[in-house]
Amino acid sequence: YNHLPPICEKLGIKEPEFYLEMNPMPNAHTSGDTRVFIVVTSGLVEMMDDEELDAILAHECGHILCRHVVYNMVANYLKMGLDALGILGSVAKPVEYALLYWSRKAELSCDRCGSIITSPEVVARSMARLAGGPKSITNKINMQEWALQADNYDQIKNDGLWNKTLQFAATIGLTHPFSAVRVREILKWGESPQYKNLMQNLKAEASGKKCPKCNKRTWCKKVLKK
């Protein structure tokens, strides 16, 4: 539990209810409407080290920060409404596929929250742990090579109509992107000016630096360069 409050404070969100599910399968999820809560399984806690657990909790907090829980609830109600009205086929399925596409993009946003609290490398490591199991195996994974699989996948899926069709069929029902894609995207973002500037700004904010002009805690570039 002690991992959660500092993460919520850094992200500027109200601390949600937090539950431990006795389940050997490693997993975490965020849910609720008026009372938002995070659930982690005992299998996840046993598998992850402290940094990896922080990355996963920050990912779940990202769903709260970005209001994914509310949007997902509205989307599910919309889908249930279409089903209840008997609206199928040409209307309901495109709506469902659009929601799943949004869900995959939302996961990438939350991976960024995890990297802000820890680092892109820790986020990638936590994904390796979830995908491959114990440290004796996952510590040997070359993250750059794993991310390269996503590039190879992109080349294949863009090579002709048939491959595009296969890719569409393979991903259309997924709520999460493929792990290799998530690793590539978070490592790529970790090299971006946006991420580096953001981390500089957060570091300056945490140190209490103030702008010499307005005497306020700020993300002023002049202050950050000192």
Q: Model features per residue range: what roles?
A:
Residues 1, 7-13, 88-156:
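Short helix/loop segments within enzyme catalytic domains
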Residues 131-132, 136-212:
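Pan-zinc metallopeptidase signature
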Residues 48-52, 56, 69-73, 86, ...:
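Charged, alpha-helix-enriched surfaces in structured cytosolic catalytic cores
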